């Protein structure tokens, strides 16, 4: 299969939404029956985002095969059916590490290692390898044109486009067209300068996607086309919308997909966007509203919980409920009390690392249990629910995780030293293992117990969900907690690790060690989140048993 490439770059400012624009194009092309994949090239020197602060970089998205990747890959999976893998995201750090490893091994036979050709060739090789077996590969380069970090990537995609030829490669550039209220018009000069910068490194964009708070007037589109060397029909307006799921329809109405198919000589049927139309309809026509409290410590940057936020929205669509997320800093609960949780229809405690704010999360789990408020715990959210139950119901005073208190009398959560992965291999870790890339990562099989809420929600005896953790329930103390009434409803493939717990004495109290948010999509939702939001709706209407 011959793969055609669309390289996506951004200019003027960062955070314009390259990932959303690229994913929207991918969604339309997929709706035309084409097999599409996506890639994100990140210019930073970290090998992967696994050890980066969520408040700096946003969430780390975990793929099925266990790669810790950029949050844009989450957008890709929510917009198209293709599952991302380790090959769909790589960083400058990863490329340099691989090249230096080869140099040490002697693979270059004594050559002087340089950015050109060695680094650029390594980037090109990875792009080609990551796109095999698809009709179209959309390759997004992180950062902004002009950044020094992205130059090797820009040079690599320039070379690749030359080698592939015009019939197999094209460039889409996303830029900002600001509206100046004082002048009463949009300004095209930043876009012209951005394209000029791109031309200076040998790249002529074929499509310009113009971000603005309004549609670009026809005269301004003509001006952009004239001064940026693109056809007028290739100047696409991407105005601000109240839902990112409206963007595929917005850009399709301007013929973005036709530009691609014409360029590559692809004869494909018209895009069927009926699934996206259904999503937009559900979003615009809710029958009720719920407020869900998200108790975390990275709340100053909502992107730190991007997939959880989106999964809650998807669950709202499935239940025809408008979901409002109220972020609650777990440290504030420690200082101001659980009164901060009053008036919520449900409580969600997401994943996290480190002891800052952990007692606030434990108190949130206690509040939900005692007040019969729907509770969903994810990763650390499951562990704090277990710790709270052990302390306050099972009589294990001072129970904790060894992540936060190595001297606790009741270490109900401890480091996983050994587990069996999806392929049957035994993975081992110790306290001295590196932080980066050493967690239990990726999709794992989980057995669900009969007669549990988890089994009822999923409607299946076995499921596959993605993990990202290095601490687990301590099996030595597990019987004591179960005897006190907590139900273990999900177990790992070898039935040795606890994957899900629930409280049978509570109307809806479910927690999972895995991250269900990574597999939720706007078209399909996710059973765990759908059940959680449904319970929140019942609670808000007073239908919950107290």
From Swiss-Prot:
Means of activity regulation: Allosterically activated by GTP, when glutamine is the substrate; GTP has no effect on the reaction when ammonia is the substrate. The allosteric effector GTP functions by stabilizing the protein conformation that binds the tetrahedral intermediate(s) formed during glutamine hydrolysis. Inhibited by the product CTP, via allosteric rather than competitive inhibition.
Mind telling me what this protein is named? CTP synthase
Role this protein plays:
Catalyzes the ATP-dependent amination of UTP to CTP with either L-glutamine or ammonia as the source of nitrogen. Regulates intracellular CTP levels through interactions with the four ribonucleotide triphosphates.
Chain segments carrying region Amidoligase domain: 1-266
Cite the active-site annotation: 379, 515, 517
Coiled-coil intervals: none
Q: Which domain of life is it from?
A: Bacteria
A biological process term (GO) from this entry: pyrimidine nucleobase biosynthetic process
Catalytic activity as recorded in UniProt: UTP + L-glutamine + ATP + H2O = CTP + L-glutamate + ADP + phosphate + 2 H(+); L-glutamine + H2O = L-glutamate + NH4(+); UTP + NH4(+) + ATP = CTP + ADP + phosphate + 2 H(+)
Q: Where does CTP bind?
A: 14, 147-149, 187-192, 223
Instruction: Quote one Gene Ontology molecular function term.
Output: metal ion binding
Q: In which pathway does it act?
A: Pyrimidine metabolism; CTP biosynthesis via de novo pathway; CTP from UDP: step 2/2
PROSITE patterns to which the protein is assigned, alphabetical: GATASE_TYPE_1
Where, in this chain's numbering, is Mg(2+) bound?
72, 140
Query: Which positions are annotated as binding ATP?
Result: 15-20, 72, 239-241
User: Secretion signal: which residues?
Assistant: none
Q: How does it assemble?
A: Homotetramer.
Name of the gene: pyrG
Question: Could you tell me which InterPro entries the record lists for this protein?
Answer: Class_I_gatase-like, CTP_synthase, CTP_synthase_N, GATASE, GATase1_CTP_Synthase, P-loop_NTPase
Q: Share any extra remarks.
A: CTPSs have evolved a hybrid strategy for distinguishing between UTP and CTP. The overlapping regions of the product feedback inhibitory and substrate sites recognize a common feature in both compounds, the triphosphate moiety. To differentiate isosteric substrate and product pyrimidine rings, an additional pocket far from the expected kinase/ligase catalytic site, specifically recognizes the cytosine and ribose portions of the product inhibitor.
Residues annotated as domain Glutamine amidotransferase type-1: 291-542
Q: Where does UTP bind?
A: 14, 187-192, 223
